[in-house]
Amino acid sequence: MQDAVQGSRPRGYTLPVFAVASARAALHHLLGIPLEKEGGRLVVAVQAEPQSLEARIHIPVEQVAALEKTTALAITRSDPGPHLDLTRDTPVWAWVRLEERDPEDPPLILEAGEGLGRRTDGSPAIYAYARRLFEINLLPGIPPDCRLRVRIILPEGKLLAERTSNAAFGVLEGLALLGTRAEVEPSSSVESLEQARQELQQKLERHKHLIFCVGSHGQQVALRQGIPEDQILRVANWIGPLLVEAALRGAESIHLIGYHGKLIKLAGGIFTTSSHVADARLEILAAALIRRGGTAEQARQVLELRTVEAAVHYLDGLGWAAPVMQELARQILERATGYVQKYAGRSLLLAVTLFDRQGQICAQVGIP
């Protein structure tokens, strides 16, 4: 894929961009507008930033076809560029249909197909930036007296959603079209670490007691606890290096807040938490169960399960979930304290809060 003006750094784009590209390609096919070609591939131009008409990017279209006279289907494939992202290469389908429109009807209807999540009220998990992107790219092309119905389908969405904490924030049965920009915000690259370090330095100039939140979900939990946003730092996958950086730059305390399925890695001494680096979560969970008095057979059952969430559900049925979560929080605190002492050569007061998929706090340690 290409930008209208190419930079030297490879670029990747967020899931909403590909959903909109698929819908736009399908609409163009219905209207008889030929797609462009670049390097022998079909591409569709997408206006990626609502504030800038010039910010157009070209997204490859894998397949496009008319299904009936008024319906079409197009497929693109998610490409986050050099950044680590679980949606890499996942197909993004858009089924579109032109319908007669009454004057009082909206011209554009967005629906969640298979694999695109729904919010608890049943509406599609399509958030503000994505909705605006659909509007600016589709509304100008809808014929007068017609409305366009768009159904986004993510065939791998339900499976991929099991590896996220979306359900903790009301996104059910699939992925969400999230984000506030077209380009992927790096979470595991060296560039993202440098950005986080700079933000950490700025916050430490004003506050010596900070909250490290793992991702936007952790940030939402922190804000619900009444924590001032100015004290919150989103740390993505670089928890260990940023803890050390905070200690070296004079932080007095750090409160770690995160989804248990992510922070659990710290209990096993894994301080760069990207799944592309290491993933021993079920093993860590099984070890915590044994430490709390669980049986070898119960630990074996944990190891047989596919996800942390399934394992926690299993433990909950046995009455073990709460004590095991508390044990994990204790281990995280102990390991993180030792990590900072080892690599920064000084102590740092730490606290840990774990929350579950429903966004409810399930364990805390180190809280005064």
Swiss-Prot record:
Q: What is this protein called?
A: Cobalt-precorrin-5B C(1)-methyltransferase
Q: Which UniProt keywords apply?
A: Cobalamin biosynthesis, Methyltransferase, S-adenosyl-L-methionine, Transferase
Q: Describe which pathway this protein belongs to, using the record's wording.
A: Cofactor biosynthesis; adenosylcobalamin biosynthesis; cob(II)yrinate a,c-diamide from sirohydrochlorin (anaerobic route): step 6/10
**EC number assigned by the record:** 2.1.1.195
| Family according to the record | Belongs to the CbiD family.
Presence of the UniProt keyword Protease in the record = no
Q: Does the keyword Transmembrane apply?
A: no
Name the catalysed reactions. Co-precorrin-5B + S-adenosyl-L-methionine = Co-precorrin-6A + S-adenosyl-L-homocysteine
* Entry GO MF terms: cobalt-precorrin-5B C1-methyltransferase activity
Q: Which InterPro entries match?
A: CbiD (IPR002748), CbiD_sf (IPR036074)
Q: Which domain of life is it from?
A: Bacteria
Taxonomic source organism = Synechococcus sp. (strain JA-2-3B'a(2-13)) (Cyanobacteria bacterium Yellowstone B-Prime)
| Gene field | cbiD
Gene Ontology biological process terms in this record? anaerobic cobalamin biosynthetic process; methylation
